[in-house]
């Protein structure tokens, strides 16, 4: 059995799809379906069972026998970069992850988890080393602190621990994310409502490393198969502008002209204007598959999104 926490979320459900595509279906999904709309991410997937996050955490803390576990993909977290309840964030992202990590270490279960490029903050180099890490928000801090915790354990660990610093992930199964959904998702919605797509002032200068969620799932499955441990950037190694995303969406729809809107005051000083994954460690680990460009990934995503709308 493989356990996927956050399995009804965007990355978790895409990992399940990738597992299904290999013929694997013995999957336990852990999530919180208080937001019932997330069920839609699981409808076309084959899983063995579902358990609520709180019940699962209780099982983990109690050390319950959950059966034979081949691996845990830990994608469940509060991923809102605008959430400032630090106690909630640390309980949900840090303590929960520690409890799960120790459960896996005690049983030598491979543990693959979601970190984030938010650990880097406003730096201009994105290398998986302490001197490049300075998160801008409590979400980024919660991810950074768990990475630090993992670094202390890695040298002595007798089973796989692998963290992925996801950059700007976009693609299928993110419709439940609201304001945290990708720019491509929002621009598509604006065009479908008969509006012009909107970008913040300065978007031609903001560059991010946008990675297609199918590529993220492929990275996760490759590392499980390889057994490699460590903390790795999960991006394309290319920084592309928000304008490039908008151009790809407009190109798909063949209509709409980009409008600029004022940059929100609440994001000033807390916004990553530039991200670009350094892939040196990822490639050195042996992962050599190519990553979709924005033009390629957004085109595929738009076809999926408008087919399922």
UniProtKB/Swiss-Prot annotation:
The keyword NADP applies. It catalyses: ADP-D-glycero-beta-D-manno-heptose = ADP-L-glycero-beta-D-manno-heptose. Its cofactor is NADP(+). Its EC number is 5.1.3.20. Pfam families: Epimerase. GO terms for biological process: ADP-L-glycero-beta-D-manno-heptose biosynthetic process; carbohydrate metabolic process. Keywords: Carbohydrate metabolism, Isomerase, NADP. It comes from the Bacteria. GO terms for molecular function: ADP-glyceromanno-heptose 6-epimerase activity; NADP binding. CDD domains: ADP_GME_SDR_e. Binds 1 NADP(+) per subunit. NADP(+) binds at residues 10-11, 31-32, 38, 53, 75-79, 92, 143, 169, 177. Pathway: Nucleotide-sugar biosynthesis; ADP-L-glycero-beta-D-manno-heptose biosynthesis; ADP-L-glycero-beta-D-manno-heptose from D-glycero-beta-D-manno-heptose 7-phosphate: step 4/4. InterPro entries: Epimerase_deHydtase, Heptose_epim, NAD(P)-bd_dom_sf. HAMAP family: Heptose_epimerase. Belongs to the NAD(P)-dependent epimerase/dehydratase family. HldD subfamily. Homopentamer. Catalyzes the interconversion between ADP-D-glycero-beta-D-manno-heptose and ADP-L-glycero-beta-D-manno-heptose via an epimerization at carbon 6 of the heptose. This is ADP-L-glycero-D-manno-heptose-6-epimerase. It comes from Serratia proteamaculans (strain 568). The lineage of its organism: Bacteria, Pseudomonadati, Pseudomonadota, Gammaproteobacteria, Enterobacterales. The gene is hldD.
